[in-house]
From Swiss-Prot:
SUPFAM superfamilies reported in the protein's UniProt record: HLH, helix-loop-helix DNA-binding domain
One term of GO molecular function: protein dimerization activity
Gene it is expressed from: Msgn1
A single GO cellular-component term on record: nucleoplasm
Natural source organism: Mus musculus
Ranges where the bHLH domain occurs: 118-172
Protein name per its UniProtKB record: Mesogenin-1
GO biological process: cell differentiation; segment specification; somitogenesis
Protein purpose: Involved in specifying the paraxial, but not dorsal, mesoderm. May regulate the expression of T-box transcription factors required for mesoderm formation and differentiation.
Disruption phenotype: Mutant animals die during gestation. Premature death starts around 10.5 dpc. Severe morphological abnormalities, such as enlarged tailbud, kinked neural tube posterior to forelimb buds and reduced tissue mass in the interlimb domain become obvious at 9.0 dpc and thereafter. Head and anterior body structures, including the developing heart, appeared normal. In the trunk posterior to the forelimbs, there are no identifiable somites or segment patterning, although the anterior-most somites appeared normal, with decreases in somite size and disruption of myotomal patterning in somites 8-11.
Gene3D superfamilies: Helix-loop-helix DNA-binding domain (4.10.280.10)
Subcellular locations according to the entry: Nucleus
Classification of source organism: Eukaryota, Metazoa, Chordata, Craniata, Vertebrata
Family annotation (Pfam families): HLH
């Protein structure tokens, strides 16, 4: 770090000694124990119409500094003249409420996962019951179909059972209608 400082000092062609000392002090980040604040220096330092980065320097202020800032005890305030914000870095040390307990976040997520598993089980049970009821109804339909519609030695599939049932009902309807009236046209 000393070599860097010496190298930096040798490059100070256009800077006066007060600028160099302030610039080097800003590099010493390890020695700062207090929060930092940006403060605009006098406008004579910058010739550009808009403020530039060179016209700001870091100044260490105690937390809750009320000198030029307006703001409450929340650690935030604004400078009226420069329009800058003071930030209380002690606010960064807080932990969110869900991290205060050792397994806080994990516990919340665990209960959510448990709810999800429980809901899936209930949905699975409802689906099983629905499929069982449907299978019973199809089995009853197969029992009412005449043996002509059944395949030899193999049970009918669900779709075959429904198609043959519709066809059988159509034939029965035709039989009833033909006893005194004309036959009903077959639909495909």
């Amino acid at each position: 770090m000393d070599n860097l400082g010496e190298t930096f000092l040798s490059l100070e062609d256009g800077l006066d000694s007060s600028d160099t000392a302030g610039l080097l002090a800003s590099w010493d980040w390890k020695s700062r124990a207090r929060p930092l604040e940006l403060v605009q220096e006098s406008p004579t330092q910058s010739l550009s119409p808009a403020p530039s980065l060179e016209s700001y320097s870091e100044v260490a202020l105690p937390c809750g500094h009320s000198g030029a800032s307006t703001g409450g005890s929340d650690g935030y305030g604004s400078h009226e003249a420069a329009g800058l914000v003071e930030l209380d870095y002690s606010m960064l040390a807080f932990q969110p409420p869900y991290l205060h307990t050792a397994g806080g976040l994990k516990g919340q997520k665990g209960s959510k996962v448990k709810m999800s598993v429980q809901r899936r089980r209930k949905a699975s049970e409802r689906e099983k019951l629905r499929m069982r009821t449907l299978a019973d109804a199809l089995h009853t339909l197969r029992n009412y179909l005449p043996p002509v519609y059944s395949q030899r030695g193999q049970p009918l599939t669900k779709i075959q059972t429904l198609k043959y049932t519709i066809k059988y009902i159509g034939e029965l309807t035709d039989l009833l209608n033909s006893s005194g009236r004309e036959p009903r046209p077959q639909s495909v």
